Structures are given as structure tokens and as C-alpha cells.
């Protein structure tokens, strides 16, 4: 609203070009509301000093979890979350899933289900994949049943998937900021 007022000159001042306007924020998660508004009104912008909110790794990961729940056909989302956090599903296991999905002309989620039913995968990876697939199905049902509002469901998905816990256990200096970004995303 403030930016539109400056641009249109509705506060008793002449209209101003936004080319030389800057917004300073203390923490990166504060940029989200600005970015949302800029995208809504079609205002081009640049973020200096860090990536845009929706380009951050943790936001893209979280969005992939939310996308796979709304569409289990979303192979890009599944590829992003299958081993995030680590589930013991390395490149070989992921290649087997891709081959099975291609063989049956189906999604990666369905390919993973087929692979598990054929007992092609073993060990920790198979157990963790089974848990992930059953969680995705359960989250889909919760979404359909409208058992939770969207904020509660997003928090539940990120918690139960282990994604929030991964960042809580991370001891790098970036981890607290990433957790703040996740909180900002779901609120």
C-alpha cells in the first residue's frame, strides 16, 4: 500500500519512480510479505544480499512437500523430497524408482510403490521409503477430509516428514534462519 501511494503520489506529493526505492529488512524472512505483494501487483524487484524468499533451499523443499501432497503425480516434487531429510535412498535406489516408473508409464510415487511391493529395495531405504509413501497418502487424506486448516497441515507435514527436525538438529549458523523462513512460509 505504501509503495502504491508513493508511485501514484496520493499523499500530497508528486508521483515518484520506484527505480531508486529501497526496502531494508533486518532478517531475510521479513522479505516474504514484500515479495508476495510485489508478485501480486506485478512490480519487478531485486533482492540484494541474498536469494529471493521462494528461491531459498528450505522454502523450495517445503513447497515440494506441500506439492506432493496436493498432487502425487508431481515427479519434480518427489525427486526433491525423497531423500530430504536423509532416508538412506541414494542414487541407485532413486534410479530403480525412475526405471520402474518409466517401465509402467506412471509417476515416481507409483513407481516407488511398485518397487516396494516387488521387494526390490531392502534395508533402511525400503523401510524409510515405505514410511514416506504412507505419510504422503495420510497427508493427502487429511487434506481431502479438511481435518486441519492449511497452516496446521503444513506444520504437520514438515514436522512428520522430519524436515523441521533436520533443521532443528543442524548446528550450522544458517539453521536458525532457515527455521525462521519455514515459520514465515506456513503462517
Question: Residue spans of the language-model regions?
Answer:
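Helicase P-loop NTPase motor core
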Residues: 1-44, 67-71
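Accessory C-terminal helicase-associated subdomains
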Residues: 8-17, 29, 115-187
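Conserved short internal alpha-helix adjacent to the catalytic or cofactor-binding core
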Residues: 40, 51, 55-85
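C-terminal helical "lid" of AAA+/P-loop NTPase domains
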Residues: 95-100
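A short beta-strand-loop micro-motif that forms or neighbors metal/cofactor-
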Residues: 101-114
Amino acid at each position: 500500500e505504501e509503495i502504491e501511494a508513493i508511485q501514484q503520489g496520493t499523499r500530497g506529493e508528486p508521483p515518484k519512480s520506484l527505480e531508486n526505492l529501497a526496502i531494508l529488512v533486518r532478517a531475510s524472512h521479513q522479505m516474504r510479505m514484500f515479495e508476495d505483494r510485489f508478485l501480486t501487483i506485478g512490480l519487478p524487484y531485486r533482492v540484494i544480499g541474498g536469494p529471493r524468499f521462494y528461491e531459498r533451499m528450505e522454502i523450495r523443499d517445503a513447497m515440494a512437500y506441500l506439492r506432493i501432497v496436493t498432487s502425487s503425480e508431481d515427479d519434480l516434487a518427489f525427486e526433491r523430497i525423497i531423500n530430504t531429510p536423509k532416508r538412506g535412498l541414494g542414487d541407485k535406489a532413486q534410479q530403480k524408482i525412475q526405471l520402474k516408473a518409466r517401465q509402467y508409464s506412471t509417476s515416481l510415487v507409483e513407481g516407488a510403490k511398485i518397487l516396494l511391493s516387488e521387494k526390490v529395495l531392502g534395508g533402511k531405504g525400503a523401510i524409510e521409503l515405505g514410511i514416506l509413501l504412507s505419510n504422503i497418502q495420510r497427508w493427502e487424506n487429511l487434506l481431502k477430509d479438511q481435518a486441519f486448516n492449511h497452516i496446521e497441515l503444513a506444520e504437520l507435514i514438515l514436522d512428520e516428514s522430519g524436515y523441521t527436525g533436520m533443521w532443528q538438529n543442524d548446528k550450522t549458523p544458517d539453521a536458525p534462519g532457515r527455521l525462521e523462513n519455514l515459520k514465515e512460509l506456513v503462517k
